[in-house]
Amino acid sequence: MEDRQNDQNDDVFSFFSPSFSAATPSTLFNRSAYSSSSSSGDDESQPSVDDSNKRIDYMIQFLDRRLSEDGNHDGIGDGNGSDSLPEFVGKCGESGIFKVPIRSAVHPNRPPSLDVRPHPLRETQIGRFLRTMTSTERQLWTGGEDGALRVWEFSELYGSGRGLEVEDTAPYKESLGNEFGSAAVVCMIGDEGSRVVWSGHRDGRIRCWRLRGDHGIEEALSWQAHRGPVLSIAISAYGDIWSGSEGGALKVWPWDGALGKSLSLKMEERHMAALAVERSYIDPRNMVSANGFANTLTSDVTFLVSDHTRARVWSASPLTFAIWDARTRDLIKVFNIDGQLENRPENSVYPDFGSEEEGKMKVTASKKEKAQSSLGFFQRSRNAIMGAADAVRRAATKGGFCDDSRKTEAIVISVDGMIWTGSSNGILMRWDGNGNCLQEFAYESSGILCMFTFCSRLWVGYSNGTVQVWDLEGKLLGGWVAHSGPVIKMAIGAGYLFTLANHGGIRGWNVTSPGPLDNVLRAELAGKEFLYSRIENLKILAGTWNVGEGRASTDSLVSWLGCAATGVEIVVVGLQEVEMGAGVLAMSAAKETVGLEGSPLGQWWLDMIGKTLDEGSSFVRVGSRQLAGLLICVWVRHDLKPHVGDVDAAAVPCGFGRAIGNKGAVGVRLRMYDRVLCFVNCHFAAHLEAVNRRNADFDHVYRTMTFSRQSSSLNAGVAGASFGVTMPRGGNALGVNTIEARPELSEADMVIFLGDFNYRLDDITYDETRDFISQRCFDWLREKDQLHTEMEAGNVFQGMREAIIRFPPTYKFERHQAGLAGYDSGEKKRIPAWCDRILYRDNKKHLGAECSLDCPVVSSISQYDACMEVTDSDHKPVRCVFSVKIARVDESVRRQEYGNIINSNKKIKVLLGELSKVPETIVSTNNIILQNQDSTILRITNKSEKNIAFFKIICEGQSKIEEDGQAHDHRARGSFGFPQWLEVSPGTGTIKPNQIAEVSVHLEDFPTVEEFVDGVAQNSWCEDTRDKEVILVLVVHGRFSTETRKHRIRVRHCPRGGPAKNHFNDGTKTSGQINALHRSDYHQLSNTLDVVEQLKNLHSP
């Protein structure tokens, strides 16, 4: 983990990185349909003139740097210019936690990424962070805290953002947010059948969205679904929408009811339709309340996933799971995270079936019983009370409180019908479709926040920003740090796995990664660095002063900072001993325990320094932190503020018991031009002989300083609170790869330490020191400096740099006594010393390194001195001016270059051609006729010799067959769901090479249709008895490819007792085409009716 980076290379570390080149070859999505060059508009198909001019500017700058290199390697300094001061460099900075973090144009320890939305500054996202994401065939959709939706067309992924919300983001369309009272988007799901996206919101509403070309995003339908927030949403194999909320609330919105009809209405007609949809839901809990399960279904429904393999729906809370039949909405099983069945009431009349039987059982009542089981007010109240009592009972049984580290945080279903759940302790669990836990895996102790499956792979996103890739057998294929923050959502499209980070950044990763494509793409992209990188130049003024509990005059502040701030872009000020005393220290410790910071005296200092810097006109304060007598603050120029953000603060006490703030450090971290800069103000142990304690103080600060958002009134409004994701550390589990995390300071591109380090002069007397000072023989004095001695030995400030000191020692003076005669002349006659220092570390691995994406932050020192004329304290203030070069990436140009490589590179084209193959498959029939609860076997043969085929069966729509035998009134179904009278099992699956898969196509007798109002069945009527026809589509994928082979199978439903028409509506001869395999060819399994009869017999006399 020693190469963790910030977001350009983005806080990347080599968590788990097998050789990409040695990975198994895989199939990539066909991107030709999505490349930016396929767009019809000229603005979309060609890079803009501005982008071309940028490339020219970057190339010229690159050539200028190369031409000037020859003259920059002389002298003691680091080669950043003739005005740079020579520097002293500490030892032992080449390894361990003091090693410079790895940076490069394309990081070597992770696959190249497509930055769809580069990491935005947190301060620009307050109240509008992206929180969820889904994809359709041609778009990537996201939802935010403000209720707004953003949509990226896959055809524009490589395009320029042209000054949108985030400058370097890919082009996108956006809906309106809070302007129209919309609440935060909590969950989303794409519906390919209806070509819409459904979203659940914090205000309890479900909304339906369409993309209308140039008109942007249109809200097609909206209704109040729940009283509380819509926490989860799923679409079943039958096209019904399932939604979950707080307190176990679960509702089903049938596609065959008002929902499906409403989408075909005109906009002005949809208001009344929304009212009908709102009342058309089914509450599946009402249908099972009598059997004893409902009392366990009281936890928030945080997850809903549709099992298309078995036509089921899984609902989940953090600790329990429930499995439902997607067609009948009957409850099948309830169990907890240990796989144990939830207890039913002791007086339950129902038997306790074994785990195998549980997989087949469907606890239900007959349709007649359902209609009669409408619950009145008292019955529902009784159930609520019983549910609460049962929850208390179960909590008491389990010890009252659950282990938060075991909570379920993500759940997905893979194409082979296996269910995968991830918990907050990093444990990944594999379940079969009947709810039996098969295996547990753990390779990472950080919490799992999201997962995604497609064909043969499973992707897992963690709270530490890591993404792992697994196969469906549980084998770990690779992993890397995808973002600098938690990965909260995933989606797939256009050949990429898209990951959404908690900070709002979106990246696309090749679905074959780790794979052979990565090395080619990495080399090509790195070779074009000069086209998309540029150098920014700025100056930083850092000042430190131990103020000795005093207050400075305006003249002193102007002398120290006012003049030096001219021409600098960033000012960092660290103060020590702002206030001391036992009472102050005790109060500070008490405040820290409750999250309070700052003091009136600290605020006075900030205001006075702000006035000196002309705060408000020239500078703006971006961050500060106070711990007892330690205070640090950072100001930046107004014109630089748009490029500065993600400001965090930290404090580390080093006083008594590492708990009191009389000694310690405070720090501020910020991100500028996508690089991380840290500023740390320290006050270490005093006294001449306490060298080891000072070294230990530094080591403690360096290793333990952890930054967090600021809450202090000293920085009000700078970094407000927002919807966040915690990053649980989780205990180690068996098999977890445990690698010691690098300190946060180790990951910064530049760290500046300033403060009263308290290092003194050794082996010299007071009088000798005064003589050397009067003669300005600082070279002799530096040989006695404890800090340089310890740095030379590699004991402290390892690998850090300091300009050669050419000013008198800054401690200790008599207050208000000018000149060098002011040194302590009292009884103690403390030996003068350079206690007040400023040191730094940038990205340079060696002296003379040039600024580039491999070494993105390079600094030198142009001024390092003390203000000897200031007499307000027993210490003199010290200041240092840094000349900093920062290499930054133009993500818009880089994204275009990425697209050019993908679409034109010959090696990549050859790889794609070899890898993007779909196995050849054949089906046993193209036409099926069903009647009288018929069942037919559809056989699918994989003719490939070596490649696995992945299939899914969908329904394109349903038609009515008229007397002439022709299909009419074709209607699409939501999410390509099956009609209620048809059961297809399995709906998804895998077929090994040269193997055959059998799919059961079964006619379910469904003579009546019920109308539900407010969750209760109200009316029923006979179903239309005319013949029906559906078009089933068998969609076959290769291992990774969305390029597909499709087979269409016509399935005709004839009413019971009616004649079977032997002609189809395609106008072709059908004799010899119909190949309906009858029930004798099908092994009949027990069904719902069998279980119902068994249950009814239990009550028979």
Curated annotation (Swiss-Prot):
It comes from the Eukaryota. One of its GO terms (molecular function) is phosphatidylinositol-3,4,5-trisphosphate 5-phosphatase activity. Optimum pH is 6.5 with Ins(1,4,5)P3 as substrate, 7.5 with PtdIns(3,4,5)P3 as substrate, and 6.5-8.5 with PtdIns(4,5)P2 as substrate. Residues 31-40 have a biased composition (Low complexity). InterPro entries: Beta-prop_IP5PC_F, Endo/exonu/phosph_ase_sf, Ig-like_IP5PC_F, IP5, IPPc, WD40/YVTN_repeat-like_dom_sf, WD40_rpt. Residues 31-54 are annotated as: Disordered. Residues 749-765 are annotated as: Catalytic 1. It catalyses: a 1,2-diacyl-sn-glycero-3-phospho-(1D-myo-inositol-4,5-bisphosphate) + H2O = a 1,2-diacyl-sn-glycero-3-phospho-(1D-myo-inositol 4-phosphate) + phosphate; a 1,2-diacyl-sn-glycero-3-phospho-(1D-myo-inositol-3,4,5-trisphosphate) + H2O = a 1,2-diacyl-sn-glycero-3-phospho-(1D-myo-inositol-3,4-bisphosphate) + phosphate; 1D-myo-inositol 1,4,5-trisphosphate + H2O = 1D-myo-inositol 1,4-bisphosphate + phosphate. Keywords: Hydrolase, Isopeptide bond, Magnesium, Metal-binding, Repeat, Ubl conjugation, WD repeat. PANTHER family: INOSITOL 5-PHOSPHATASE, TYPE II INOSITOL 1,4,5-TRISPHOSPHATE 5-PHOSPHATASE. This is Type II inositol polyphosphate 5-phosphatase 15. The lineage of its organism: Eukaryota, Viridiplantae, Streptophyta, Embryophyta, Tracheophyta.
